[in-house]
Amino acid sequence: MRFQLRKCSKCFQYTLKEICPKCKEQTISAHPAKFSPDDKYMRYRLAERYN
């Protein structure tokens, strides 16, 4: 399954396209990464987020 919904990081508009039709910026996936209790790198992601 391929995630199709994308979000512009500049104007925060949701779209299905790779380029935002409003501001012409690159869009990113609007879906979070899958959760895994065996995640080896969770410590680093949490440190990056909260420090």
From Swiss-Prot:
> Which positions make up the signal peptide?
none
Write out the transmembrane intervals.
Answer: none
Extract one GO molecular function annotation from the record: snoRNA binding
Q: List cellular component terms (GO).
A: ribonucleoprotein complex
Gene Ontology BP, a term: pseudouridine synthesis
Recite the UniProt keywords alphabetically: Ribonucleoprotein, Ribosome biogenesis, rRNA processing
The answer to keyword GTP-binding applying to this record is no
Give yes or no: UniProt keyword GTP-binding.
Answer: no
Q: Check the record and name the Pfam families matching this protein.
A: Nop10p
Superkingdom field: Archaea
NCBIfam families per UniProt: PRK13130.1
Q: Which family would the database say this protein is a member of?
A: Belongs to the NOP10 family.
Q: What does this protein do?
A: Involved in ribosome biogenesis; more specifically in 18S rRNA pseudouridylation and in cleavage of pre-rRNA.
Q: Which HAMAP family match?
A: Nop10
Q: What is this protein called?
A: Ribosome biogenesis protein Nop10
The species this protein was found in: Nitrosopumilus maritimus (strain SCM1)
